[in-house]
């Protein structure tokens, strides 16, 4: 053990601050993150291509899907998660939910999509068009192509359920405060690399065929079948890696190998005997805690802001690409670029800057980045309205291409910062909490609150579309709401930073009191990588 607590070399401390004794826990966790993120990236580009490309409503369908599809789905899946958590083990819940998602995606690609218009509600859509105003055409398209809408909803829920709740749930469960500052930065790099790989593979599949299939009814279906094959294969590896981690956490205290060095056998038994909260108490746990409410506001603001920006950008892209294959190729390239920027930020900036300047600085980077890049994107749109296109003409771009390009840049940087700074600081914010607050508060925030944020933006869009009939005519109101969301986000992060410092310091003192021998061995070497600067002396870590 003495060799394991030696400080790292400067190079390794910067790029790979993981001890050899931590490899059996860290490597499966990193691979699990990669494959969960790989599926997330494939599903993200596929759902957009399926629903948006060639649609007469374009990106206007997104606000209606967020409210009438994703919110009910998120509430239902959160209730299912709470109900299952009351009755079954953590491992069974994970495998059952992941297996359910994989089964649906396979069924859609092999059965539902080939049936085409036989399943779609064309007659009902024609009647709705005569009743509803022109601004509600997104709702009509959502109802008419209900199977595509269902695929969109399930793909979105993969993010909130499998990535945010299940994966980060197991990560928080097996990772200590001392490990989190070192583990989470590298795990986020793994997620970013998965975006690069998924984006390039999806782009390649738009031009080539991995496995030819006689089942394909059109060119897009051939691409969809190959993407689904990769999703299911990655899903199998996800289940295998989870079982490996689950077994590891059960056996490590008995074997005495130090893999779960900060949780004693008695603590593990207490965790297993801890009474489960009822499904309906998920939200009540959230509302009882000001700290959890602060995290919820941050998540709410991010999802509101990114949705407001993304719909405007995708509306520009829909006007350029009408083919699903071409649209998918474009979005795949954006996904790959996002992964590249995220990986660079994760390796060279995120982990080190949070350890050096603290949680608050890391948490403020996301809203400030969105404020700057969003300002450039919206500024270009306003310039187009004012015919101020000297730059576009000089570069040989049409006004539409220029604004779409700036929107893509904005999306790449917003997503990249989200996958590095936002996700990392959000997950770190849960660590000082008690087990009940951590598990059920996180499930409520990731499963419901994140969707409420997007739905808030969607409700704004729906109201504005009914009044103005198009996204372009809603820009002034969208700008005002966006500025309010970003301003409130920055204020709450400043408050949360103070609370996080206090709670982390208290947790460090409690851990030091419970584990005096570990404290005596380590405290002379290093300080916590994740507490605020003024609290760093309170939390001991192994770096």
Swiss-Prot record:
Pfam families: TLC
UniProt KW Electron transport keyword: no
Region feature (Disordered): 510-543
Major site of localization recorded for this protein: membrane
Keyword annotations of the record: ATP-binding, Cell membrane, Membrane, Nucleotide-binding, Transmembrane, Transmembrane helix, Transport
One GO MF term: ATP binding
Amino acid composition bias (Basic and acidic residues), ranges on this chain: 533-543
Membrane topology type: Multi-pass membrane protein
CC per GO annotation: plasma membrane
Transmembrane segments: 23-43, 61-81, 92-112, 150-170, 185-205, 222-242, 292-312, 334-354, 361-381, 389-409, 452-472, 477-497
Location within or outside the cell: Cell membrane
UniProt similarity note: Belongs to the ADP/ATP translocase tlc family.
PANTHER family hit by this protein: ADP,ATP CARRIER PROTEIN 1 (PTHR31187:SF1), PTHR31187
Protein name: ADP,ATP carrier protein 2
Organism field: Chlamydia muridarum (strain MoPn / Nigg)
Lineage of producing organism: Bacteria, Pseudomonadati, Chlamydiota, Chlamydiia, Chlamydiales
